[in-house]
């Protein structure tokens, strides 16, 4: 069984021209391109939680991405230790030490994992999920919109590092970014439906029915096909499999597999979401100890020994008036999740980057899901958050229609030029790309000018 990474994963769509005395490895170049991109800088003006108010403490998408990168590099380091191989050795009935020697070389470098974590949110539009839903609704007959798909599009096409290949990142970096290796209009049937509300005033359409599916845009299929060229036909077919068979025409499907690098990035993102977003919500008073009791009860019913032993003390520190005690609790929780990570075998892939993933044990994953659910129920679905997101939805839907009514007059010069040059089928995508790249404040400022 081959467990070596093929050098083809370091290739780029356009071969880099060598620069004098530049000895950086490929993934360090990727990291630099992402860090120096306008899209990455824009994350500082996109809020992670919208209802926390004007408080210097709260996280933006940028600080969130930096924290995800730190957690991601810590997960990679943990995956090198022998205890991370225990479950895999049992799963494969092989010697743990031999597996450790064989598989450590598959792990991403710090440059690579940080590249993925820095880039994972750069395609997300203003106003969080509200903005995503609004753009998906406005693009419903033209391929839809989804934040992760926009990230891939930005990296491979939009960011002006090259004329037509975006940042021109390595194949392995792009593979690690793809969380859902399928096409959006395949995973979701919503783009084919013609519902009566399509002729209604878009400001009052129930946007909850237009949360996007998961996949890449059909416009970006050529780059996706280039990305998957190193895979065998069998691996390509397996990689695009869904978790379930569609039982209802309206059902949104999710793919089953992701690369090793992507599994590490996604786990780091989940930990940051479940723990650090909770910290923000506690500090600014969005959640209190009384609301936490339901989560505390669920946590005490989890079979995790560490949680059983420490959750009462963790709870006391989380809701303490002493900031250092809260930070101590947050650090303990993050450490608990990081040190629990382990290798797992995904399926019978020929490609080793797809054959293995990072995973939490079931009892630890259950704990993380409780944290994530609490943040979702009491922070994301908080009425103040939802009102802000709804306002964002209305702003983006109205602004989209305004731009579409007279694009050559109202779009910025370069965007208007791209709109003129685009095919009839792609003109809406040009407007969508422009709006998806806005920060919250910029979107509001432009809207007020119209």
From Swiss-Prot:
Family listed: Belongs to the dGTPase family. Type 2 subfamily.
Originating organism: Pasteurella multocida (strain Pm70)
UniProt cross-references to NCBIfam families, sorted A to Z: antiphage_dGTPase, dGTP_triPase, PRK05318.1
SMART domains in the cross-refs: HDc
HD domain: residues covered: 61-201
Lineage summary: Bacteria, Pseudomonadati, Pseudomonadota, Gammaproteobacteria, Pasteurellales
HAMAP family in the record: dGTPase_type2 (MF_01212)
Keyword terms, alphabetized: Hydrolase
UniProt-recorded name of the protein: Deoxyguanosinetriphosphate triphosphohydrolase-like protein
An MF annotation (GO) of this entry: dGTPase activity
Alphabetized Pfam families for the sequence: HD, HD_assoc
